[in-house]
């Protein structure tokens, strides 16, 4: 009996250890974003507008573009005329360029393409003609290049599909985390899966069957490969529920069927015409699942890909808007099947009577207001009187040949080629020091439910279930050959999993080990944080595990020790700081989804670096870079979700000596917030629109003050002027300031061309000088970030027959002003001087200015013509007779 008891005890202990192995705990995934379940406070408009610290913003201009602006625009001088332009990636079909002075559209723009856009534009000279083209990564995995005239070039980069085994998902371990053996291509796979299933059923009958996911890491061109498996998330037991009815899930990134209970930050506003997916998942309330202690109703998320008229909130007119309304203005057309399902709207917590303060209004109209739309419901009259008068008129028949069509799929019995999609901005850098620039693209692979809702398209796939194939990879292109250099395959999952294998955020490139090669950092929605070298090899101790990572990984010196730290955030409200070796420094739980990577800077002016984090609950947190503690008086509470990256900028007026930075952001309550860093005193501007894109800053109108650029989901672009003087290091022209810098540069670190040489001018002779200044004001104990590797490049377009890129490199060991001698080309043309600097940690800083060469030679010709005439006139005056001589008279002599 004793031996049997011992055997039973050993078996129980073995089963318990296996259970703990298969369902390993992770502190980041176990936490919940509880603040997202709370309602937003009511807006006191009088208190907001009657601020005690006005920033005195003035609206300089406002322009409407063709559709919603989801990705952050780019500020640049694209045609080397000395004037800044704003490159706006409209969400649907168009890339636009606005003149910074007045917001007018430049001639030749907008430029058309067939896809949607989730990424910001970049500048790169793809054809080596001395003029940088505008690179735009599209949703359908193409990187297009546009000339400054708006012409779409034939050169483009195409991301190949990912090939996976058709039955890769069959027999997988549920929620695997044991990485000691692969979960695919394993002979004993089915036996282990059946044993685990039976063990799970016996030990925990009340636990719901977990979803199946697997993380794969495999280099396609290498000899060695491995497969790593990762636990999605422990299913909720007892008092833990899958999803709560209170925060009605919002449909973000709906082309990936975002039916999970997360607020995916990488999506369009639900209900807009340009929604990434016109499918709405239906939330079915399972009344049989009631939490015992919290008494909260559990909801089950239907993963159906079909268009549903049973939307949360206003389901009544879902189908009519889609089937009847076929003509109207593109920006204003309503589509009920894509109705807004805001997680903090009126459907949430109605029992508590909390009024939601947001500009996302899902409520019905009053009778008088509703009657005013009767004319618009006369569809026949509307088509006759309205259709042909507007350039944004929508007739679905006219757009049939302009929509994207996927290429033919390869027919295979054993494998599936998954469509590639790009949901974030690529990065351009020379990661391997070969002198050739590479483009690093984070790619998500899946079958778009909207596209394959068409039976003809679905038929091409051979009857597979498209929900079983979601994957992610890093694809690196050689920009000289325009070919794929290498591919690193990362995660692989199904759509039914708690965590799915998308990549929503741009990769970050930085030198982690000081070898001069750039490493690639990326976080995936599968919850894994990868760090790989310039060849795609995963670094030791990586990947690190968190919940779904939506924001970019930030590489910066956050604790002022002179070394790079890595900061990651996730959808469960976690933020963590790591060393470059993957060791945790500190972590904090903010209790709300973090949609974007944090911004770095000395916010309160105390000489120490802070980490500033936006959340979907509306709270803006300022954390100490040393230990992650909350800096008071933060968090600052807005009245709507904050879904964009925060701008940190010095808005001090001329002569003002205040320390600290201003936090600038938009919120889903329709206000633009300007929060004083040291005091959190706030000034607001009522723009009445929502925004996912970052607020940008620069002197775009040619004056001497700093301007703010705000773009919205309604397709409006605003330019606000501030009384703060402009400085090149205050400018924030793109979300990553060129490559990998998420930190404020002014009074911190950077390089810029001095005011004496950055002005637009004409150069003659054989050489000219450019003066730069390196700024490095890191404080003790870190010291300086030297050495500084400065590369100066002169881009020469036009009819110049020599080298179009004239490059000089110099290493400086201390900050200060330096003069660089550059050659003057012997033709009449324009030019752009780019100054790029990388410090010892590989952080990238840049500045640029434009100039002309020999453009005013006709002034010399003018003097060559005028001077001889003036000389002759002078000689006539000098050589005139000195004595008076009577003039001949022709009068008649009357004496004769």
UniProtKB/Swiss-Prot annotation:
Classification via Gene3D superfamilies: YVTN repeat-like/Quinoprotein amine dehydrogenase
Tissues expressed in: Mostly expressed in buds, and, to a lower extent, in leaves, roots and seedlings.
Ranges of biased composition (kind: Basic and acidic residues): 330-352
TM region(s), chain numbering: 859-879
Gene Ontology cellular component terms for the protein in this record: cytosol; endoplasmic reticulum; Golgi cis cisterna; membrane; plasma membrane
Positions in the Cytoplasmic compartment: 880-896
Subcellular location: Cell membrane
One GO BP annotation of this record: cell wall organization
Pfam families, sorted: Beta-sand_DEX1, FG-GAP
UniProt signal peptide: 1-24
Residue ranges, annotated region (Disordered): 268-354
The protein's name in its UniProt record: Protein DEFECTIVE IN EXINE FORMATION 1
């Amino acid at each position: 009996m004793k031996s049997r008891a011992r055997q039973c005890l050993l078996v129980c202990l073995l089963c318990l250890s296996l259970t703990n192995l298969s369902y390993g705990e992770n502190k980041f995934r176990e936490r919940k974003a509880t603040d997202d379940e709370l309602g937003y406070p009511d807006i006191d408009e009088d208190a907001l507008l009657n601020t005690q610290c006005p920033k005195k913003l003035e609206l300089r201009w406002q322009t409407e573009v063709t559709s919603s602006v989801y990705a952050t625009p780019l500020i640049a001088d694209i045609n080397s005329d000395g004037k800044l332009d704003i490159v706006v990636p409209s969400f649907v079909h168009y890339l636009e360029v606005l003149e910074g002075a007045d917001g007018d559209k430049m001639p030749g723009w907008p430029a058309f393409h067939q896809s949607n856009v989730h990424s910001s534009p970049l500048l790169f000279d793809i054809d080596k003609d001395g003029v940088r083209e505008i690179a735009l990564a599209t949703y359908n995995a193409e990187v297009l290049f546009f000339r400054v005239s708006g012409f779409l070039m034939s050169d483009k980069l195409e991301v190949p599909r990912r090939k996976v085994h058709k039955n890769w998902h069959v027999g997988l371990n549920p929620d695997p985390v044991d990485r000691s053996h692969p979960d695919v291509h394993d002979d004993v796979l089915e036996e282990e899966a059946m044993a685990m299933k039976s063990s799970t059923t016996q030990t925990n009958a009340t636990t719901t069957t977990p979803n199946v996911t697997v993380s794969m890491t495999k280099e396609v061109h290498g000899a060695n490969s491995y497969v790593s498996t990762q636990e999605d998330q422990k299913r909720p037991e007892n008092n833990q529920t899958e999803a709560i009815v209170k925060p009605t899930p919002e449909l973000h990134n709906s082309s990936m069927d975002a039916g999970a209970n997360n607020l995916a930050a990488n999506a369009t506003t639900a209900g807009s015409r340009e929604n990434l997916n016109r499918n709405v998942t239906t939330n079915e309330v399972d009344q049989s699942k009631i939490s015992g202690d919290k008494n909260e109703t559990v909801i089950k998320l239907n993963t159906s890909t079909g268009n549903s008229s049973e939307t949360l909130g206003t389901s009544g007119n879902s189908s009519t808007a889609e089937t009847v309304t076929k003509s109207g203005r593109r920006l204003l057309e309503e589509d009920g099947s894509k109705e807004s399902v805001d997680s903090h709207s009126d459907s949430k917590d109605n029992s508590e009577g909390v009024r939601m303060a947001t500009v996302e209004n899902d409520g019905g109209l009053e009778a008088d207001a509703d009657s005013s739309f009767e004319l618009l419901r006369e569809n026949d009259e509307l088509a006759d009187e309205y259709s042909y008068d507007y350039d944004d008129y929508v007739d679905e028949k006219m757009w049939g040949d302009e929509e994207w069509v996927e290429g033919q799929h390869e027919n295979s019995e054993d494998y599936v080629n998954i469509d590639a999609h790009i949901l974030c901005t690529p990065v351009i850098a020379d990661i391997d020091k070969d002198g050739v620039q590479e483009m690093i693209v984070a790619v998500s692979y899946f079958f778009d439910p909207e596209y394959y809702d068409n039976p003809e398209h679905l038929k091409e796939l051979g009857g597979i279930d498209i929900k079983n194939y979601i994957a992610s990879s890093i694809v690196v292109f050689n920009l000289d050959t325009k070919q794929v250099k290498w591919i690193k395959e990362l995660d692989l999952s199904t759509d039914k999993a708690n965590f799915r294998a998308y990549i929503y955020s741009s990769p970050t490139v930085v030198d982690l080990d000081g070898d001069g090669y750039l490493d690639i950092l990326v976080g995936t929605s599968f919850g894994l944080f990868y760090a790989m070298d310039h060849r795609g090899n995963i670094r030791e101790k990586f990947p690190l595990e968190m919940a779904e990572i939506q924001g970019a990984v930030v590489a910066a010196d956050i604790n002022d020790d002179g070394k790079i730290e890595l900061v990651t955030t996730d959808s469960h409200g976690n933020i963590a700081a790591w060393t470059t070796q993957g060791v945790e420094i500190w972590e904090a739980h903010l209790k709300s989804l973090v949609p974007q990577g944090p911004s770095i800077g000395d916010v309160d002016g105390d000489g120490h670096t802070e980490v500033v984090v936006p959340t979907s609950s509306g709270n803006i947190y300022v954390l100490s870079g040393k230990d992650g503690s909350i800096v008071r008086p933060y968090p600052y509470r807005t009245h709507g979700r904050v879904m964009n990256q925060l701008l940190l900028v010095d808005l001090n007026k001329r002569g003002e000596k205040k320390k600290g930075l201003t936090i600038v952001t938009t919120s889903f309550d329709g206000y633009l917030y300007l929060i004083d860093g040291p005091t959190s005193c706030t000034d607001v501007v009522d723009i009445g629109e929502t925004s996912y894109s970052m607020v940008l800053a620069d002197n775009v109108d040619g004056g001497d003050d700093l301007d703010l650029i705000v773009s919205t989901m309604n397709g409006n672009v605003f330019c606000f002027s501030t009384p703060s003087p402009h400085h090149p290091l205050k400018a924030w022209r793109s979300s990553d300031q060129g490559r990998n810098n998420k930190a404020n540069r002014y009074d911190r670190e950077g390089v810029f061309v001095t005011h004496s040489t950055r002005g637009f001018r004409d150069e003659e002779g054989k050489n000219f000088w450019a003066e730069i200044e390196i700024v490095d004001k890191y404080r003790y104990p870190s010291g300086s970030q030297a050495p500084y590797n400065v590369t100066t490049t002169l881009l020469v377009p036009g009819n110049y027959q020599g080298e179009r890129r004239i490059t000089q490199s110099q290493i400086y060991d201390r900050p200060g002003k330096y003069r660089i001698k550059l050659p003057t080309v012997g033709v009449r043309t324009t030019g752009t001087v780019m100054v790029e600097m990388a410090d010892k940690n590989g952080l990238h800083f840049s500045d640029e200015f434009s100039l002309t060469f020999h453009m005013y030679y006709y002034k010399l010709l003018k003097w060559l013509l005028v001077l001889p005439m003036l000389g002759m006139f002078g000689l006539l005056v000098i050589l005139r007779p000195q004595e008076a001589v009577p003039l001949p008279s022709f009068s008649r002599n009357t004496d004769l």
